[in-house]
């Protein structure tokens, strides 16, 4: 218990301090920038100026070093109410992703005569990955038969994580090599697959724990693989 409570408060502080960053993050907002889209019947990279009612899209070939010719912009009308002619559009952007995450639970396969284990110890980690964000522009019909504008956003990412956590160390998980019980400090690391829907992010993690003290050689779970479910906050 001595290790768990302070570490829990540390993770809680990290997550709460990241909330303001999340509110200011642009990853779940459709803003000016480069995107891939299927305008003109083919996938191409364009630069988007997102206005309140109209979107201006410029081909990369039209972006020179001098003054931009605004007459070459592709105009996409996207007012609050659906215009007479509108086709649903999708825009993709790719960025590097930096998150803080915590693994809610870990499933450990059988090891050294131990049955499968389900662990829920406290932990926190930094995540670095490559992310794709998708923005779908469409209109949704209301019961009053009015079509209102909406932007559906989701993102997905794959990357690596590393951090610190706790693990219960006792005679059972050391094959009676120890006669004491304590919460050991471990380094957790591995690969994560992250899915984001607007502000909510969750991920499937594949990792291992390494005990950071002299008893690592007798801990049956040391450097053994596990599968977990994580939640996190984007900080870039």
Where does each model-flagged region fall?
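Short loop/turn motifs that connect adjacent beta-strands in outer-membrane beta-barrel proteins
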Residues: 85-95, 134-156, 200
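Outer-membrane beta-barrel translocator domains and adjoining extracellular loop/strand segments
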Residues: 110-115, 140-141, 170-177, 215-219
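Transmembrane beta-strands of outer-membrane beta-barrel proteins
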Residues: 96-100, 124, 154-162, 202-204, ...
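N-terminal leader/presequence regions that precede the main folded/catalytic core
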Residues: 2-10, 15-104
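Residues that define the transmembrane beta-barrel architecture of outer-membrane proteins
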Residues: 94, 118-124, 154, 183-189, ...
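Outer membrane beta-barrel transmembrane domains
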Residues: 155-187, 192
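Transmembrane beta-strands of outer-membrane beta-barrel pores
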Residues: 102-108, 132-134, 162-168, 197-199, ...
């Amino acid at each position: 218990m001595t290790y768990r409570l302070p570490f829990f408060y540390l993770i809680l502080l990290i997550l709460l301090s990241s909330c303001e960053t999340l509110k200011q993050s642009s990853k779940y907002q459709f803003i000016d920038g480069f995107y891939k889209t299927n305008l003109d019947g083919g996938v191409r990279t364009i630069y988007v100026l997102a206005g309140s009612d109209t979107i201006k899209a410029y081909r990369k070939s039209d972006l020179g070093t001098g003054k931009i010719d605004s007459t070459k912009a592709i105009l996409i009308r996207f007012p609050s109410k659906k215009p007479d002619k509108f086709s649903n559009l999708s825009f993709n952007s790719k960025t590097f992703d930096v998150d803080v995450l915590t693994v809610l639970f870990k499933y450990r396969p059988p090891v050294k005569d131990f049955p499968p284990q389900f662990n829920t110890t406290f932990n926190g980690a930094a995540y670095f990955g490559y992310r794709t964000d998708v923005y779908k522009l469409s209109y949704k019909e209301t019961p009053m038969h009015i079509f209102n504008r909406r932007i559906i956003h989701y993102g997905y990412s794959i990357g690596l994580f590393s951090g610190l956590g706790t693990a219960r160390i006792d005679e059972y998980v050391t094959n009676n090599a120890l006669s004491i019980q304590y919460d050991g400090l471990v380094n957790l690391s591995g690969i994560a697959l992250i899915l984001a829907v607007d502000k909510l992010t969750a991920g499937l993690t594949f990792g291992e724990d390494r005990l950071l003290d002299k008893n690592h050689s007798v801990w049956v779970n040391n450097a053994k693989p596990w599968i977990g479910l994580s939640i996190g906050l984007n900080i870039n």
